[in-house]
Amino acid sequence: GDTYLYENPWTLPLGFILPDIVETGWKRDLSSPADVQNDLSDVLGVPECLIFTDGEEQGNRFSFTAPEDGEYYISVANRQIDSVKLDVGGESRSIDTLKRGYLVETGYVKAGTLILLESNDSAGSMDASAYRFDEAGLRALYERLNQHPFELETLGEEAMKGTIDA
């Protein structure tokens, strides 16, 4: 079969220095992983990576229409819901183990595409939110985190040596 190799231009080094505000100001216990990610961006003073997108929730269903082309994610805050059906423009798939609290990835969708998430569990409202991934936000976050990188000098089986300019 065909093999594809992609370059990730925003790979962080083994280590880097974070400003003190990250330890004291970053809220890591928010109910949505998207909110945790965006709070890190806010604390570091860079644009958010995940842009909130309006959606509508009715019972065990959450839906939204993509306002622009992009990669979208859905956060389900109700941790009692474990299994959902995702429908993106008429193509459906099942997603299990949602209780772990990860984001549901819709993939790249065109503007005007209807996205529907339906719970298979009878656990009440999903309390769902949709987000569009913003590449410029990720680039800004990467650049902020990579301001003081760990420069690896040597790497052995039991140790590594390097420097960080602070």
Language model region names:
Residues G1-A166:
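Flexible, solvent-exposed extracytoplasmic
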